[in-house]
């Protein structure tokens, strides 16, 4: 039909103008109808899947497997992100510029190292597991490290997946984000503007979550993945269960190579990625006899705990290695989300965990992960702070802010704005939930709601409008 109408558009003299106009109008109507019909239909898009022939975790392979035309037209809405309510670019720019960037004092430019731990949570937070000595033993070194650190809980947006939501919240300070399509505001850019090198490491593939491209948009100088470094250190398949040793060693070597020059390094671990086998397990941390739970649930818990046991000890070793160095280093460790534990959270359900997210207790059970901010002796001396105590609970977008607070740094203007937002609510959840005076709520006062809208406008401006070199 499109070809037939195209013939009508071919130039054949003045007498054909009306026919060409009708053909053009028909093509437009047909095209719009096709787009609003089949091309925009999620069910049609779903039926074009070729999952058996591709890696379903690769966005590029998914895109190509469904055909360029369908994939492109289906992605058109991503090219036009929705602006926040009442968005005014000039007002957002003016608000952001009213908070000027503050430099890190020259004598205080300590190395900053961050590690986001895959599916890391403290299972002793759950009463159902806290009573097992075997489980307590797994987390005992972590609890000891918390006593030496500022520590608390991240109140994430995600459960059992979507790891980059927490990752990018930490790196950008944004409580929500759209698809990154170009250079965007980030704390990475602040570090490089302060004379830091900015390095990224992940013992997995660069195409996962399109991290290689996004990292360039965030401002990293260098990103190392399986394809350009870690593949020589650990097999990417094995890395899902055993790679924290290699990652910790890599971070130490990278720090040493900087030779005292300011370095911001950030790593995303891969060890303990789900799913966890339910047919067998090596170490019986929990058993059906002791717990009353099914063998399948116990196996999943045991396999997760086996990996976490190694993870905890590797990052305790990392702190010991850092403490033995003269280079001042501040380290932040945090989990991205709770681990997958069976379809529909079957293991959690069998354990009787409260996941009613309308209550604060259930919300924390579902979304909270641990974090700690630790400093070696050299950094404590340089910064004049002890880095211990209760760090508070908050959204991932406030974690870098808390780190700067601990260091005594004012930071970039956006971070100063974030402190004002955090004072209103340390929780900014994508489900529209806040934490006000310790109460989980979807309601803010008119004044606080107005500031929150301004905050969202600044985020949008910073991500989509502001220019970055």
Annotate each language-model stretch with its function.
Residues 1-109, 133-150, 181-185, 309, ...:
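N-terminal secretory/membrane-targeting segments
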Residues 93-107, 114-117, 122-469:
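Solvent-exposed soluble domains appended to multi-pass membrane proteins
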């Amino acid at each position: 039909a499109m070809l037939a109408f195209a013939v009508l558009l071919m130039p054949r003299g003045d007498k054909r103008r009306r026919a060409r106009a009708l053909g053009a109008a028909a093509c437009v109507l047909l095209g719009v109808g096709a787009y609003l019909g089949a091309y925009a239909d999620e069910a049609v898009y779903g039926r074009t899947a070729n999952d058996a022939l591709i890696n379903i975790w690769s966005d590029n392979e998914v895109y190509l497997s469904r055909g360029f035309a369908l994939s492109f037209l289906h992605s058109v809405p991503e090219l036009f992100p929705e602006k926040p309510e009442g968005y005014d670019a000039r007002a957002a720019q003016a608000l952001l510029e009213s908070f000027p960037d503050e430099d890190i004092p020259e004598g205080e430019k300590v190395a900053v190292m961050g590690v986001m731990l895959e599916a890391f949570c403290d299972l002793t937070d759950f009463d159902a597991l806290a009573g097992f000595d075997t489980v307590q033993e797994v987390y005992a070194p972590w609890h000891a490290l918390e006593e030496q650190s500022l520590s608390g809980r991240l109140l994430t947006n995600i459960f059992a997946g979507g790891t980059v939501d927490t990752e990018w919240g930490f790196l950008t300070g944004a409580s929500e984000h759209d698809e990154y399509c170009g250079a965007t505001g980030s704390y990475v850019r602040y570090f490089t503007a302060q004379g830091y090198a900015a390095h990224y490491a992940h013992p997995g593939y660069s195409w996962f979550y399109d991290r290689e491209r996004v990292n360039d948009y965030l401002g990293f100088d260098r990103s190392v993945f399986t394809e350009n470094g870690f593949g020589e250190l650990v097999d990417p398949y094995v890395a899902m269960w055993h790679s924290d040793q290699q990652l910790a060693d890599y971070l130490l070597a990278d720090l040493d190579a900087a030779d005292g020059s300011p370095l911001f390094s950030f790593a995303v671990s891969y060890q303990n990625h789900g799913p966890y086998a339910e047919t067998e397990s090596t170490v019986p941390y929990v058993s059906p006899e002791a717990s009353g739970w099914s063998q399948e649930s116990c196996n999943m818990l045991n396999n997760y705990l086996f990996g976490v046991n190694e993870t905890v000890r590797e990052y305790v070793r990392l702190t010991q290695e850092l403490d033995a160095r003269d280079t001042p280093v501040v380290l932040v460790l945090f989990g991205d989300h709770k681990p997958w534990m069976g379809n529909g959270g079957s293991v959690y359900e069998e354990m009787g965990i409260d996941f009613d997210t309308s209550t604060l207790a259930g919300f924390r059970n579902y979304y909270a992960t641990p974090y700690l901010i630790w400093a070696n002796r050299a950094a404590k001396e340089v910064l004049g702070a002890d880095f211990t105590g209760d760090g508070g609970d908050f959204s991932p977008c406030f974690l870098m802010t808390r780190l700067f607070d601990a260091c005594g740094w004012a930071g970039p203007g956006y971070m100063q704005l974030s402190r004002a937002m955090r004072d209103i609510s340390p929780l900014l959840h994508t489900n529209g939930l806040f934490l006000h005076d310790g109460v989980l709520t979807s309601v803010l006062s008119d004044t606080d709601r107005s500031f929150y809208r301004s905050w969202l406008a600044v985020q949008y401006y910073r991500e989509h409008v502001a220019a970055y070199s």
